[in-house]
């Protein structure tokens, strides 16, 4: 069961990867329409303003079509075959599902307690998806319907029909079966979802009123579950789903950013839900403090080597919010340090929230575009509060990690036993053995890693499923006994390996999509 949840979590990350760029576009266009930044260029009748508005509308695509994008994105990670056709089947099925709901509620809305004559939005519980007026099931409905369609696709796509029915094979058969299945799904949704919406409204009120403790607990769970890959199920419903605000924190913040920027009311009063989007601060301030502690405690003769490892990892965490390359340098050798990290991250978020900081998350690039620049005029105090608390926690992380590393003689980078270091330095020999020594360009590098990982997993015949998230290659194998030791993966360039029975996660880094593609190409070639 855990393996299936991990696969789903990884698959959910494909749509999430679209948000950073879209968020930056929206934020920058809002800034460029603000007269405080561009003066007379912000005249609504001017050509500049109109051109910026055109660009802004394009930036809203991802946010306005969120359920549709999640529905289509899920097959990328969960379909076992013919991924493009699975995406097509999901698109058709999800639209069919919403058309069914629209028709049912048009005729029998009052029977389900739904006034379908209302305008969409607000407290109506209604929305439009690809122009279809329907119940607002948010990303929950999209994920469920996409999951059902993917199951049908995996089970029936290769089904052989009699020759005279050959035209109905493949995607056509999948869509036909899904079409029939969507009728009861739509009926059940009309029957159950309005009641769930009432429950969600109560949950939203409860979470918002949970205050500082709620923020602490949310942030702790989001961090502590990273090694399992299940952290997506913590932040997903808050950031992209209806846990605390109907449209999700990410969309709600972007939609109201201009109003927040022009208001002098405290941000915590304007958007208290933003407390559940502070987990990114540990990626900036916490990771910097941890990196400094690891550098300080490294052997003098190893500091130069360690700095080459830690600087890029810390910068990646601080700038774009990808923390695995740093966190996995100490997670496997000292798991208790990761627990400490999660506690400190949660405490930092709670302290920031208590002092009025909200929705300052992810990495510096996103924070600069979505917080610092647009809010500087009326909310500069919040920015300085965030920075002050963050700097304090850099010091706290540094002191705590330095103390624990030295007290318990944790073998972090630069402190390994000599014989362990010798093993690590066999990387060049190991790569030469596998024919990687001649590789010079990035494409060859990805292929080299993929080849090494495939051999470490025991070859093509031992691979059951392949998936990935932002930084991890997720592999299910038939026989875990055929999988090589962690050092074999690290020698090929991995930051670490998570093992859970037949389910493995290889920490690759931001190049994981390219490595996965090369991995799958090698499997097909073999």
From Swiss-Prot:
One of its GO terms (biological process) is phosphoenolpyruvate-dependent sugar phosphotransferase system. Residues 447-526 form the PTS EIIB type-1 domain. Its EC number is 2.7.1.-. It is an enzyme of class 2 (transferase). PROSITE patterns: PTS_EIIB_TYPE_1, PTS_EIIB_TYPE_1_CYS, PTS_EIIC_TYPE_1. It is a multi-pass membrane protein. The keyword Chaperone does not apply. GO terms for molecular function: kinase activity; protein-N(PI)-phosphohistidine-sugar phosphotransferase activity; protein-phosphocysteine-sugar phosphotransferase activity. Keywords: Cell membrane, Kinase, Membrane, Phosphotransferase system, Sugar transport, Transferase, Transmembrane, Transmembrane helix, Transport. Pfam families: PTS_EIIB (PF00367), PTS_EIIC (PF02378). It is found in: Cell membrane. InterPro entries: Glu_permease_IIB, PTrfase_EIIB_Cys, PTS_EIIC, PTS_EIIC_1, PTS_Glucose_EIICBA, PTS_IIB_1, PTS_IIBC_a_glc. The EIIC domain forms the PTS system translocation channel and contains the specific substrate-binding site. The phosphoenolpyruvate-dependent sugar phosphotransferase system (sugar PTS), a major carbohydrate active -transport system, catalyzes the phosphorylation of incoming sugar substrates concomitantly with their translocation across the cell membrane. This system is involved in alpha-glucoside transport. This is PTS system alpha-glucoside-specific EIICB component. It comes from Fusobacterium mortiferum. The gene is malB.
């Amino acid at each position: 069961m855990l393996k299936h949840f991990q696969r789903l979590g990884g698959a959910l990350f494909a749509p999430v990867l679209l948000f950073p760029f879209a968020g930056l576009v929206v934020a920058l266009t809002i800034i460029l329409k603000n007269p405080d930044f561009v003066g007379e260029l912000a005249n609504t009748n001017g050509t500049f303003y109109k051109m910026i508005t055109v660009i802004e509308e394009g930036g809203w695509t991802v946010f306005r079509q969120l359920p549709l994008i999640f529905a289509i994105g899920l097959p990328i990670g969960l379909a076992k075959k013919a991924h493009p056709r699975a995406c097509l089947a999901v698109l058709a099925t999800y639209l069919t599902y919403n058309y069914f709901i629209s028709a049912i509620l048009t005729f029998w809305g009052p029977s389900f307690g739904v006034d379908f004559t209302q305008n969409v939005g607000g407290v109506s519980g209604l929305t439009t998806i690809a122009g279809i007026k329907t119940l607002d099931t948010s990303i929950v409905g999209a994920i469920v319907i996409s999951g059902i369609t993917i199951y049908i696709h995996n089970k029936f796509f290769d089904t052989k029909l009699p020759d005279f029915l050959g035209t109905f094979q493949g995607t056509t058969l999948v869509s036909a079966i899904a079409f029939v299945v969507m009728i009861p799904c739509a009926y059940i949704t009309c029957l159950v979802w309005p009641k769930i919406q009432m429950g969600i409204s109560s949950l939203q009120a409860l979470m918002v009123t949970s205050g500082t403790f709620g923020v602490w607990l949310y942030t702790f769970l989001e961090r502590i579950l990273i090694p399992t890959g299940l952290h997506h199920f913590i932040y997903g419903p808050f950031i992209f789903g209806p846990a605390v605000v109907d449209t999700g924190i990410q969309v709600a913040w972007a939609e109201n950013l201009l109003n927040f920027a022009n208001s002098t009311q405290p941000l915590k009063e304007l958007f208290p839900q933003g407390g559940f989007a502070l987990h990114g601060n540990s990626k900036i301030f916490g990771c910097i403090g941890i990196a400094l502690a690891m550098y300080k405690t490294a052997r003098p003769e190893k500091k130069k080597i360690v700095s080459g490892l830690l600087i890029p990892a810390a910068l990646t965490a601080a700038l774009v919010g990808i923390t695995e390359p740093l966190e996995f340098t100490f997670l496997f050798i000292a798991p208790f340090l990761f627990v400490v990290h999660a506690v400190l991250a949660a405490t930092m978020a709670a302290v920031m929230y208590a002092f009025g900081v909200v929705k300052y998350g992810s990495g510096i690039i996103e924070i600069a575009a979505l917080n610092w620049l647009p809010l500087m005029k009326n909310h500069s105090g919040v920015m300085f509060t965030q920075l002050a608390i963050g700097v304090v926690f850099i010091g706290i992380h540094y002191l705590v990690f330095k103390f624990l590393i030295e007290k318990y003689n944790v073998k972090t980078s630069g402190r390994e036993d000599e014989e362990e270091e010798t093993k690590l330095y066999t990387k060049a020999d190991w790569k030469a053995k596998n024919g990687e020594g001649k590789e010079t360009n990035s494409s060859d590098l990805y292929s080299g890693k993929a080849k090494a990982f495939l051999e470490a997993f025991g070859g093509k015949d031992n691979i059951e499923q392949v998936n990935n998230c932002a930084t991890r290659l997720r592999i299910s194998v038939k026989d875990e006994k055929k999988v090589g030791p962690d050092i074999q993966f690290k020698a090929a360039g991995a930051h670490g390996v998570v093992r859970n029975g037949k389910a493995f996660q290889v920490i690759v880094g931001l190049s994981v999509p390219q490595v996965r593609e090369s991995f799958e190409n090698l499997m097909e070639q073999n």
